[in-house]
Amino acid sequence: MAKKKIGLLVMAYGTPESLEDVEAYYTHIRHGRKPSEEALQDLIGRYKAIGGISPLAKITKEQAHKLTDSMNNIFTEYEFNCYLGLKHIAPFIEDAVEEMKRDGIEQAISIVLAPHYSTFSIKAYNDRAIRLSEEIGGPVIEPIEQWYDEPKFISYWADQIKETFTKIEDKEKAVVIFSAHSLPEKIIAAGDPYVKQLQHTADLIAAAANIQNYTIGWQSAGNTPDPWIGPDVQDLTRDLFEEHRYESFIYCPVGFVAEHLEVLYDNDYECRVVTDEINAAYFRPNMPNSQSIFIDCLTEIVSKKMKEVVDKDLVLNNN
């Protein structure tokens, strides 16, 4: 008997795979408006500063395929097929949905490689996928909407922080900054849970790592007229130093799951500039990337959704 196929739609922001792709990528982010030459060269300069191109594309593919393999090892009566859908560069989310349809996939589970729910992020990804699937008559997509408090996600970061603290002599003079990508402030007034979820993640990790000196901050804000959520991690670093005279700063960009421009430049370069300026030590624990412990975390998240799908199918088949 043939195994039932399940589509595993893994969605992420995407990144250019070469410097030649940067302009098209940036134009897509700007809703079709080409960036000025100055803005384009600034972005290209940032990529060059981290080695020429971001490792994100390679890492995202590894995460998606390793997750799919893991799911197939657990749910042996099903066949999970991997589909990668990106927000701002090919393969786009819509490409992945159309490919599932062509492959005859009738049911799919979607996961966004970002832990915190926001109308700007996870909701937007899932809406794009579900909207098209409904227009073309399938597949039925079961979305995972958030996983900011997943125990294995929390324990990953707690362990990273504990490891980092072994390198610090005066632990009372160290502070952890948990961060995520800033978004326009207007989402808060609309009741978006994004900020509260980051705070909850930070509280859970801090408790698991047994640390008292920590706070949340925001990074990589867009250059638009609208105000974005703050404080920015660089400003926050200066403020914390002025108020507490911390000697060590540990940056945990928990809103991201892989090394990419926002971590390798915005944290490892820009935040380090500030810590050098105030003569403090800079630390940034390892990102989850495609480490087996993080793949186990993602597998746990998708498995919970898969069990819901199976239970739903049983109810429908028994009626």
Curated annotation (Swiss-Prot):
Keywords: Cytoplasm, Heme biosynthesis, Iron, Lyase, Metal-binding, Porphyrin biosynthesis
Catalytic activity: Fe-coproporphyrin III + 2 H(+) = coproporphyrin III + Fe(2+)
Residue positions binding Fe-coproporphyrin III: 13, 30, 46-47, 54, 125
This protein's record includes keyword Plastid: no
Species whose genome carries this gene: Bacillus cereus (strain ATCC 10987 / NRS 248)
Protein family: Belongs to the ferrochelatase family.
Name of the gene this protein is made from: cpfC2
GO terms, biological process: heme biosynthetic process
Biological role stated in the UniProt entry: Involved in coproporphyrin-dependent heme b biosynthesis. Catalyzes the insertion of ferrous iron into coproporphyrin III to form Fe-coproporphyrin III.
Principal subcellular localisation of the protein: cytoplasm
A matching Pfam family: Ferrochelatase
Pathway annotation: Porphyrin-containing compound metabolism; protoheme biosynthesis
Protein's recorded name: Coproporphyrin III ferrochelatase 2
EC number of this enzyme: 4.99.1.9
Keyword Protease annotated: no
Residues annotated for Fe(2+) binding in this entry: 181, 262
Cellular component terms (Gene Ontology): cytoplasm
Compartment annotation: Cytoplasm
